Structure formats: structure tokens, C-alpha cells
Amino acid sequence: MIELFKEYLQQRRYRESTINGHLQNAGYFLKWVEANGLQEPENMQYNDLLNYVQYEQQRNLDVSTINLRISSISKYFEFLKEQGTVTRNPARTLRIKGKVKSVIQNPLKYDELLSLYNSYKAVEKDKSVDWWKLSRHIKERSQLAHQRNIIIVGLMIWQGLHSGELEKLEVNHINLNEGSIYIPSTARSNSRELKLSTQQILMLHTYINGGIREKLKPKADELLPGNVHNHVFFLTEELKGINPQIKNALHIRASVVLQWLRQHNKRQVQYMAGHKYITSTEMYEVQELETLTEQLSKHHPFG
């Protein structure tokens, strides 16, 4: 029956990623029906659906994710109606009320993220400081730290890395020939391999092979010597000076994930972001859908 449901969705010209989401959500529901020994869908009542919702709530799924699943279930019942299996859709008017928490307020746009990188890369040292009076060692350390921070900003903006992932990076995780980076797993995220941007490849080549990293006195094979959490904190404070909208490092990461959702399907974004659970990605997806709906309502208030 699921294969026929897939054909039904394809005939309605849904995107492949959307179809996969509906199939997955309908699958969750049907497994629950089977596990609980419930009646066939044609005999399902509204109260049965409420029991399913309660089950998902007990699993601590948020309101937005549950409503996404209800939407898929509703489409499944519309498919069954067309097949003549059911005469009504008990999920058609079912929606769970509750406050949907946005992942992030005022996310940065793609061009703002790129501008942030380019602006930081070109930033001049504070002109209020008389750099000529500082020792050569201090000036060199400052310049080296700036080069290291350019690498960090790039990894935050193009790969959406958080400090825990940055801390675990080693030189052998960078493949300059393939233009890729391997990101090890952490307690918060899965491992993955992502592409590097052209700008990153050039900077990483200089950083790794040009002696910059070695001068920062790394321990063993670590890519970013020193206390990475401190680096990210103070770097973020500098980035706020370039773009006051920035709240913290997670603000940047969330903006990147939302941008990915405009370009890739949900499963791809889950992999790229290292999310352990698809529900983490769905939280971003719901915010993006709500943003688009709000924009459409502004342009077409009576639509």
C-alpha cells in the first residue's frame, strides 16, 4: 500500500524530499497501528488518532514535528479515500496547538554569511594600538591567531561546525586534493564528510603547508591549536562587531542549516548538519516553512 501511496504523491508532483518525508511519517503511524494491534485504517476513528498523538507527545516530540506527522497521515487518508478504502479522513482537521519554538530569531541570509567571512578575512588590526611599539613576537602571534580564526570562520559558515567539532579536527581530516573535510562524531553530532569551498582550500593550504599551524605549536595532529572553545567565544565577539545581528556561534550554525534547507532535501541536511535524529532537522524545516508562509501572506494577504 505504501508504494501506491508513493505513486499517489508523485502524481501530485510533490518534490522527492517531500514525498520521502510523507512516506516516513505515514510509516511511523502504520507501525504504531500494527504494534498496538489496532484496526485497519478504514475503521480508524478520531480518538484513535488522538491516542497516536498522545504516544508521540510521551516520546517528547515537539508540537511542530507532531503536526508534520499529522499532515502526512492526513494525506495518507486522502489517498485511501481515492482508493475507495475509506469514506472520510479523520485527520483532516486535527492539529495540535502549542507554542512552536523557533530554532533561531533573525537568521542570517546567505549573502550575509559570505560577507561575514570576507569582512573578517580583510579586517585590519585596531588602529588605536601602536603596533610598532609591540614586540615582534606579539605581533606575529596576533597575525597567526587571525589566520587561524579565518579557518574557523570558514568552517562555521560553509560546514556549520560547532566548537565541539572544531576541537576534534586533525590535519589528516583535511583532504586538499579532493577538496573535502571529514568531521568526527561528538556526543552531539554524527560524523560526516563535506565539501570545502574554493576559498577554504586556498586558506587551508597556506595554513597547513605554509607553516602557520606549526608556529601556533599544535599538540600532535590537532588542526586548531589552543583552547578552541575560547577561540570561538572571542572570535564571535569580533564577528559581532562586523554584524551586530549575531547573537552567538549557534546563531551562525542555525543560519547555515536553514540555508541548506533551501537547497537540499531534509535527509541531506540531516547528514550535512550531523544531526543524530531527523526531528532535529525537522525543527529547522518547520521554521523555514513558517517563514515562507509569512512572506507569502505579506505579498498575498487574501490568498
Residue ranges and their predicted role:
Residues M1-G303:
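Conserved catalytic core of the tyrosine transesterase superfamily
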